[in-house]
Amino acid sequence: MWKLPVVFIIENNNYAMGTSVKRTTNVEDMSEIGKSYHMPSFVVDGMSVESVHEAIEEASARARKGEGPTLLDIRTYRYKGHSMSDPAKYRSKEEVESYKDQDPIEQVKKMVLTKKILKQDDIDTIEEDFLIKYFLKQIIII
């Protein structure tokens, strides 16, 4: 891959559409793909905002310094099906609930409340503003 200043990100949510990654490839550790190109490759806890931020910062710094590409296998979870027509019946309720307990957005909310960085009213306002902007974009796109 020469010394291209690229950060390759695999958003690994455990499923390829409706099929478990374990059933679609013999390479469970996607970071091995980058290693086969002699590229620094790392598994990242995608359920941790801090871990994702740190990994992207380091990979970006490598790219900026001309040290070449990096591959990040960011392990996260998709709560819903692949599309509107996918009811996600291939997963158990227990599996989904176990990941919801680790939800990165909820973890950040807890942290900012615990450290008194924000109050619940602030979080509610941020969420409301986001939803308004999100739905306005959807209306404009249509």
Model-derived features: positions:
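Glycine-rich ThDP/TPP pyrophosphate-binding loop and its adjacent helix/strand module
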Residues: 1-140
